[in-house]
A protein has these predicted regions:
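Acidic donor-binding loop of glycosyltransferase active sites
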Residues: 122-126, 304-335
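Nucleotide-activated donor-binding/catalytic signature segment of Leloir-type glycosyltransferases, i.e.
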Residues: 94, 98-104, 281-310
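Conserved catalytic-core segment of nucleotide-activated headgroup transferases in glycan assembly
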Residues: 63-77, 219-297
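Short acidic active-site motifs
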Residues: 114, 138, 170, 276, ...
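Catalytic binding pocket for nucleotide-activated donors in carbohydrate/polymer assembly enzymes
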Residues: 178, 321-395, 402-404
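Conserved sugar-transfer catalytic core signal across GT-A, GT-B, and GT-C glycosyltransferases
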Residues: 138, 247, 314, 338-339, ...
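C-terminal alpha-helical cap of glycosyltransferases
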Residues: 408-429
Length: 429
């Protein structure tokens, strides 16, 4: 299978520029930088390579956020970092957040000659793969060029595992190219490594690594125009984070119920996608709720039940401004949940729904520690009211959530130090 893949990648190699130009027309590529994916127009490499150049191959925005604290740690210890990702959103995030000593480049396409150009230019000593997919040419080319290979947070979706097991021999061969494989301690699919006879070690979820960076947002508050005497922070307030269109009726109903039972209540909603705000507004108004949007510039007052935060990048400010954080994407099946660590890092009680496939390992651990509330869509109202009516319970959940997040955030630094020592010890043997 691998030989066929490599042959086909050579055959379609001349077509790759046309593929990227088609994506460019759809707005999916950076017009000034898309050639980086073809091994061209790279930024200047490091004049001083410090302790060595390390390559982090991350899929997209989520993976970029998860490895940023690790990158910061490595840079502070004298390493130079090249981070490659494939999406525009991840590129923008890294542009604004990478430390000096780290650079972002768009990921090379899975073509041997392109990958060799990348390695020749940047001269990395190791590849850290932070992906849910294996790229045969990437793995084999890096190995042949003498790089150490680390599969960090290794996991495969059910669809990916099913696909690869049709070619188990090739799958096993690729996995055995890695010097180190680390998978989440709670990853239920880890038996794929056992079935392939591949050695691996367990680690805490990479999502925990984000916590240290999130704590820097503690002082951010939402800049809201309010009527004289009205202050959201003094109210019983919640924020629904990353709500989806399929959850709008659930959110609207919950707010209606809470408003009827809890005095001085106001809800903020920071939807996952801004273009859903019009339908969200309609669903809220259909429940008889008085709604204002942040972009309207209208003053928020005690007459309002809901403030829709129809702007990007304000979730930390919303969390700090309100009392309880309700993390959406988890109240209907099929989405998989969103980041529950952000409100935990900011010392807020956290409520999430029943459908958190993407965060099951973290939520299970938080439930064991009494650090989160898992609620059905029908129980949101009751859980919110209980928190505001019982201040000691409110403080307990906020404190435990924060303690859990901070404790877990430290495990990755120790792990990375161990990996780096193992990599360079192996190279010196």
């Amino acid at each position: 299978m691998i030989l066929i893949y490599q042959f086909l990648s050579i055959v379609i190699g001349p077509l790759l520029p046309f593929y990227l130009k088609a994506r460019l027309k759809k707005g999916k590529e950076d017009k000034l930088r898309y050639n980086e994916k073809l091994g061209k127009n790279y930024p200047a490499t490091f004049t001083d390579k410090g302790n060595g150049v390390l390559w982090f191959f991350a899929a997209s925005l989520g993976e970029s956020k998860s490895v940023l604290p690790i990158i910061n740690h490595l840079v502070s210890n004298g390493y130079k970092i090249v981070v490659t990702t494939g999406t525009l959103t991840s590129a923008e995030f890294l542009k604004n957040n990478l430390p000096q000593g780290a650079i972002h480049v768009f990921s090379p396409l899975d073509n041997t000659s392109i990958i060799k150009k990348f390695i020749k230019h940047f001269k990395p000593k190791a590849l850290f793969l932070v992906e849910e997919e294996l790229w045969p040419n990437l793995v084999l080319t890096c190995k042949s060029q003498g790089l150490k290979l680390v599969f960090l947070g290794a996991k495969f979706s059910l669809a990916s595992s099913t696909k690869w097991f049709k070619y188990k021999k090739s799958f096993t061969y690729l996995l055995k190219q890695f010097d180190f494989i680390y998978t989440s301690a709670k990853y239920q699919g880890a038996d794929v490594f056992d079935l392939c006879g591949v050695a691996y070690q367990k680690m805490d979820s990479l999502k925990y690594a984000q916590v240290a960076a999130l704590t820097s947002n503690k002082s951010k508050k939402l800049d809201i125009c309010c009527e004289d005497g009205f202050d959201i922070e003094s109210k019983n307030s919640v924020v629904f984070i990353s709500s989806h269109s399929s959850e709008e009726q659930i959110v609207a109903k919950a707010i209606k119920q809470i408003s009827a039972k809890l005095p001085n209540f106001i809800a903020l909603i920071a939807p996952r996608h801004i273009d859903t705000c019009s339908s969200l507004l309609q669903n809220l108004q259909s429940q008889g709720l008085n709604v204002v949007t942040l972009s309207s510039g209208q003053k928020v007052s005690s007459n309002h039940d809901v403030l829709i935060v129809d702007a990007m990048g304000l979730v930390p400010s919303c969390i700090n401004t309100t009392g309880v954080s309700i993390v959406c994407g988890s109240f209907v099946d099929g989405i998989g949940g969103h980041n529950i660590l952000e409100p935990a890092a900011l010392v807020k009680p956290v409520i999430t729904g029943e459908f958190n496939q993407n965060f099951d390992d973290i939520i299970d651990a938080m439930l064991e520690s009494g650090a989160i509330i898992k609620s059905s869509s029908e129980a949101i109202c009751g859980d919110v009211v209980k928190l505001f009516q019982n201040k000691s319970k409110y403080k307990e959940f906020a404190t435990k959530a924060n303690e859990f997040a901070m404790q877990k955030s430290q495990s990755h630094i120790s792990l990375i130090n161990k990996i780096i020592n193992d990599i360079f010890n192996k190279q010196s043997n």
